[in-house]
Design a protein with these regions (language model features):
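A generic beta-sheet turn/junction motif
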Residues: 3-7, 16, 39-43, 198-202, ...
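Glycine-rich, aromatic-lined ligand/substrate-binding cores of catalytic
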Residues: 519-551
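Surface-exposed loop/interface segments of Gram-negative outer-membrane beta-barrel transport/assembly proteins
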Residues: 22-23, 32-129, 149-256, 283-285, ...
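Outer-membrane beta-barrel translocator/receptor signature
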Residues: 1-33, 41-44, 130
């Protein structure tokens, strides 16, 4: 609904969205309401924008265990389930969970049935969000205006997780687990600006000055209970104090900034922009909380200075340099205390938080440059845009792992400079343009190379996450690739041949943290095409990525479970390499024979199973193309 008059207008809308997920028992539902309005009175213009939404999500754990429970998600369960066993058979007649291996394995070593996860384990969340802003603008003169804007972004997310008793979890959760987490976020901002714009002959000048204030607050309340006294009754009062965990936290951050921008152009042909901003952050030390970052950019439409050329319609060169500052998260300067998880004589105390504070933190600084050219040919039927850029970050704030002797696990520090450089090329045009038909086509190609330098002394590898599959991790190596993969490789001799152990199986190298791959592609891009016939348009987009490595975690998990194509041959396996005597040999293990393994007679079936697991451990490289 919309309406208005000469001096006012408004817009009111509502929407409802409901989608069932591809995975059974999952879905997403969202309702949204929005209002925009504006009223002019003399030299003043008042504006308001308000939006409210509520979203509900039914989810499922797809891949990883929850809270280190040793369980798995639906997709992991699918990958690992035996193809000869009916996956839909997840309940016994008495309602207990069907176990593929019966009582032959501990419950934590069993396979998690995907249908059990979908029907018994419930993950839900509800999010209510309110955003709004109010603005007032005063047009003091045709070349001078002042505006003030105040805004809010507030939302609350409540999520719950229910794990039914008897699943593939750690033993403490065999009688079930239930958790609730409430996260509240509130962001308040104000912005005061004034703008001057004047034309002097062929020159146009624009000056903008302003100040802003940002206030961010969060509240978190978390509750968890497990090992319930009454079966299938998931409530916090149904668990003893030893089987409950409650916690809460809150944070506040404030950022104040002043900024300015000067723009000038001559005959809409030569352009210059200079800007600067200074921020004061509450999350940095007093001596470092003020940081300034400027930028400058310019461009020239050089075809305006050339005689008319039929085949060249437009040409522009551009260049820019910018610096951007960044603060850190709240409470990174001091070491926090939190309640100890251990009790002594019925009493508890406080201990240091696992992340050590650092009162000497500096802001992160990122500097970027760009040189580019834009060309259009044959009356704009063919277009080309090329750019070369650098993007370097200094004094990155990170939290590397510390020695256990320090009493902490992590510490916030300034360490590591990241250097990126790359190119982007876009070629587009209109190959066909008739009265009824139009075909527009654009291809974009880009490539980036990132390296990391100046890591903290003693930090040989920078891990961006603690998550790993097998022995593979996302990592950055000093003076090496920023988006590398770390892992281990086979131990090899001087000729590059795999070294076998006394049992005839491959051995790992002594270094388990080698750079075994680079996640960064050689180049990537897209090809977009739009075909139009008498107002009817069809759009097609192809994305491509060439080069780079990924770790095939899916195949790794399936091989360990014995259900991958790699592990299909269970009757015989051949392993080639150099034995302990330095001789190149090929060892063959057959399922129907007995071998000596670690000094004991062992079935060939066991040897083959161990070999498949052993061989699957090192990272395997996969090139995306």
């Amino acid at each position: 609904m919309a309406g208005g008059s000469k001096n006012s207008n408004f817009y009111l809308s509502g929407s409802y969205y409901n989608q069932d997920g591809i995975i059974p028992n999952t879905g997403y539902e969202k309702a949204t309401f929005r209002f925009n309005g504006e009223q002019k009175w003399r030299m003043l213009t008042f504006g308001a924008n308000v939006a409210y939404s509520q979203a509900n999500t039914d989810k499922t754990l797809t891949s990883a265990g929850l809270y280190g429970s040793s369980g798995s998600g639906t997709m992991t369960g699918v990958y690992r389930w035996s193809p000869t066993d009916d996956m839909k058979h997840y309940l016994n007649e008495d309602g207990t969970r069907y176990r593929m291996f019966g009582d032959r394995l501990d419950v934590v070593d069993e396979r998690d049935n995907p249908y059990w996860i979908l029907n018994k384990n419930k993950l839900k969340d509800n999010t209510e969000r309110f955003t709004g802003n109010f603005s007032i603008k005063a047009d003091i003169a045709d070349w001078w205006w002042i505006s003030y804007r105040m805004g809010i972004d507030s939302y609350t997310t409540d999520d719950s997780k229910t794990l039914a008793a008897g699943g593939v979890y750690k033993l403490a959760w065999q009688k079930g687990m239930y958790s609730e987490n409430s996260y509240r976020y509130k962001y308040l901002s104000t912005n005061l600006m004034m703008n001057f714009n004047k034309q002097f002959g062929d020159f146009n000048f624009n000056l903008m000055l302003g100040t802003s204030t940002d206030d961010t607050r969060t509240w978190t309340n978390y509750r968890m209970a497990w090992n319930f006294e009454i079966p299938d009754f998931y409530a916090f009062d149904n668990a003893t104090n030893d089987n409950r965990d409650f916690s809460s936290s809150r944070s506040q951050k404030r950022l104040i900034g002043t900024f300015g921008e000067f723009r000038a152009d001559w005959k809409n042909t030569v352009f210059l922009t200079v800007s600067g901003r200074n921020d004061w952050s509450s999350t940095l030390p007093i001596e470092n909380r003020s940081y300034f970052y400027p930028s400058v950019s310019g461009s020239i439409v050089f075809t305006e200075f050339l005689p008319k050329i039929d085949w060249l319609s437009f040409g522009k060169v551009r260049a820019s340099w910018a610096r951007v500052g960044k603060d850190t998260s709240p409470y990174s300067l001091e070491t926090a205390l939190w309640p100890s998880q251990s009790f002594l004589g019925g009493l508890t105390g406080v201990s240091n938080y696992w992340t050590a504070g650092n009162a000497a933190l500096k802001p992160e600084i990122t500097e970027s440059t760009e040189l580019g050219i834009e060309l259009r040919f044959f009356n704009n039927r063919l277009k080309l845009d090329y750019a070369y850029y650098t993007n370097n970050s200094y004094n990155q704030i990170m939290s590397p792992r510390l020695s256990n002797a320090t009493g902490y696990i992590l510490r916030s520090v300034n360490a590591g400079d990241v250097y990126n450089k790359g190119m982007e090329l876009s070629i587009g045009g209109t190959p066909i343009q008739t009265k009824d038909w139009t075909w527009e086509s654009t291809i974009n190609v880009s490539g980036n190379r990132g390296t990391v330098k100046n890591l903290l002394e003693g930090v040989e590898i920078l891990y961006v996450t603690d998550v790993q599959v097998g022995n593979a991790k996302a990592a950055s190596f000093p003076n090496g690739n920023f988006m590398a993969i770390s892992g281990s490789e086979w131990k090899r001799d001087d000729q590059g041949r795999v070294v076998l152990d006394k049992n005839g199986l491959p051995t790992k190298g002594t270094n388990a943290n080698l750079e075994i791959g680079n996640r960064e592609p050689t180049f990537s891009g897209g090809w977009n095409n739009t075909i139009t016939y008498k107002g009817l348009s069809l759009n097609m987009l192809w994305d491509f990525r060439v080069g780079g490595h990924v770790y095939n975690g899916t195949e790794y998990a399936m091989t360990l479970a014995g259900v991958s194509e790699f592990s299909a041959n269970r009757e015989k396996i051949e392993v080639s390499g150099v034995n302990t005597n330095g001789e190149f040999v090929t060892n063959t293990f057959e399922a129907n024979k007995t071998y000596t393994y670690n000094g004991k007679e062992t079935s060939g079936k066991t040897i083959i199973a161990l070999s498949l697991i052993h061989i699957s451990e090192p990272t395997r490289r996969v090139v995306i193309s």
